[in-house]
Amino acid sequence: MGGAIRIKRAKQFVKAKTMGGKITIDEIEGWVDATTMGGDIKVEVVGKGQNGNADIKLSSMNGDITLTVPKKYEMTFDLEIVNYKSSSEKGNIISDFEMDILEEDAWQGDSGNDQRKSVTGKGSVGSGKNKISIKTHNGNIVIKKH
């Protein structure tokens, strides 16, 4: 049901889901679909993402997400952080790659603890062929290059 997941190396793909716990993928060459209901996600992509599907989908309901990719990885970013007014933690997007980052000016939704603001990041590198979709609530998204 819940608990941490750690994968040291995967060649083709990883699909990982936990109800609560950290997900760490030390090396992946193919596609990734990783979801946690509460915890951080850390993924390092190796290779160039040119052979087949190398899309990346990462989602956490409450945690930081860090993705490290090669500097010439061809990708399109679609990033979103939902910050809730009731939370003391407010997430940001930090990226080694250029992208457009937009933060909503006003709180959305009904008054009270359910009010939220989104921070989104969009951009591409090279052909943009690999789709990078990352979403978290009240956490940071960090994109690094190696």
Locations of regions flagged by a protein language model:
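Intrinsically disordered, low-complexity terminal regions
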Residues: 1-146
